[in-house]
Amino acid sequence: IQRGSGDSDKVRQQITGFLKQKFPILFFPEATTTDGQQVRRLHGRLLQSAVDTQTPVQPVLICYVTPQGRLDMVMPFIGEMSFAEHLKQVLAHPAVTAHVMVLPAISSVGHDMHSLTNLLQQQMRDGLAALHAKVLVD
């Protein structure tokens, strides 16, 4: 979705249709990927589909860690490089470990878009801090 394009309403309607058919949907609510140091501000417009269909939201966090116990800065697809450039870097990169944390699902029942976004934001921030404490070397 390009910012300012008006596509988010179209995409939200498509997501709502898929959720009504019980298809799972995966997206980055930060509207981007990050280097894994922090959770950026979430954009909640697409979460409206979960509210409209009373579908729970399943937060999942990933961080890439070097053998030295530090966050890896090559694996995350960030910045301005093309996917092909990124893939080339990843394939040439030494081994790293991807740590995945699946947080408890969040019920969308009783939430509006803003309250669901705020709750998801807080749970993801808390979860990332816990994941870092578990897998990173001080």
Stretch-by-stretch model annotation:
Residues 31-33:
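Acidic metal-phosphate-binding loop of nucleotide-sugar-dependent transferases
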Residues 16-17, 48-51, 125:
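Surface-exposed alpha-helical segments enriched in charged/polar residues
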Residues 4, 23, 35-119, 131-134:
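A cross-family acyltransferase "interaction/gating" segment
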Residues 123-131:
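C-terminal alpha-helix
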Residues 127, 135-138:
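N-terminal signal-anchor transmembrane helix
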Residues 1-20:
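Membrane-interfacial amphipathic helices and adjacent loop/beta segments
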Residues 23-29:
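Generic beta-sheet signal
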